[in-house]
Amino acid sequence: MASTDDNKPPTASDFAKDAEPQFDPTARTRNWFSILLGTMPPSHQILYREDQYARHEKRDCDKCEEWRDYNLKYSPIVIFMQKNIRDLNGKLDADNIRCRRCPTRITEDGKMVRQGGGFSPEHGIQLCANEMRDSKHVEDTLAHEMVHAWDHLRWKVDWGDLRHAACSEIRAASLSGECRWTREFWTRNNYRVTQQHQECVRRRAVKSVLARPWCKDDVQAVKVVNEVWDSCYSDTRPFDEIYK
C-alpha cells in the first residue's frame, strides 16, 4: 500500500476537542477564508478536505487517468515493471489500473489514514485520484503497487501475514523511487544526506504496516519491519540494483 506523505493528520479525538458549530459544507466562502486564515479547527479541516474531494471527483479522476496513461506509455520504470509482470503471467494495464476517490479511513483507535494507492490480487491497482499531485506522483505510486503485484506473482504473498506484508512494503518503498533524495527534500522537508534512503524506506514501511487493520500498534510495526529488513531491503529483484 502506498502511503501519502508523512505529515501527521489530525486524529478523530480532535472532533471531541473542538467546541465549534457543526461544519457547514455549503458555506464555501466562509470555509475558504477559515482555511486561508488558519482559523478552521482540525476536525473541520478533515470534513472540508473530504467535501472538496467529493466535489472534484470527476476532475481528479480524469486527470489521474491522463497521468496513468502517459506513464503506461512513456515511463521507463512502469514499462519495465509491466514487462516483468507479464513474464510471470500477470497483466496490469488501463483495464485494471483504476483511478478512484479514496476517502480518509478512521481506525478503531481514532487515527486518520490516507493512502495514495493500493494493490489487490483480485482486482489490480487502485490509484487514489484525490491524492495524486502530478504525473511523477502517479509514476511513483504505480511503481510501488507494481512491486507488490510482482511480489505476489513471484512468491504468492500472504497479505494477512505482517512479515510478508512488511517485506513487500520495504521493497516497494525502496524500488519505486518514492524515497529518492529529491522527493524527500522537496516534498517532505527531510534534508539528511547520509543514510537518507534507508531511513525513508524504513519509515514508510513502518507506516504502511501500521495502517493495516491487524497491526496492533507502532511497536509491532517497527518490530516486524526490523525482523525482515536485512533480506528484504537487499533484494532488488526484478531490478539489478535500486533503480532511482
Curated annotation (Swiss-Prot):
Catalytic machinery residues: E145
This enzyme's EC code(s): 3.4.24.-
GO CC annotations, alphabetized: mitochondrial inner membrane
Pfam assignment, any one: Peptidase_M76
GO molecular function: metal ion binding; metalloendopeptidase activity
Binding site for a divalent metal cation: H144, H148
Listed GO biological process terms: mitochondrial protein processing; mitochondrial proton-transporting ATP synthase complex assembly
Subcellular location: Mitochondrion inner membrane
Domain of life: Eukaryota
Major place of residence: mitochondrion
Disordered: annotated span: 1-22
Class of the enzyme per the UniProt entry, highest EC level: hydrolase
Keyword field: Hydrolase, Membrane, Metal-binding, Metalloprotease, Mitochondrion, Mitochondrion inner membrane, Protease
Entry membrane topology: Peripheral membrane protein
Family membership noted in the UniProt record: Belongs to the peptidase M76 family.
UniProt xrefs under PANTHER family: MITOCHONDRIAL INNER MEMBRANE PROTEASE, MITOCHONDRIAL INNER MEMBRANE PROTEASE ATP23 HOMOLOG
Role according to the record: Has a dual role in the assembly of mitochondrial ATPase. Acts as a protease that removes N-terminal residues of mitochondrial ATPase CF(0) subunit 6 at the intermembrane space side. Also involved in the correct assembly of the membrane-embedded ATPase CF(0) particle, probably mediating association of subunit 6 with the subunit 9 ring.
Name of the protein in question: Mitochondrial inner membrane protease atp23
Species this chain originates from: Sclerotinia sclerotiorum (strain ATCC 18683 / 1980 / Ss-1) (White mold)
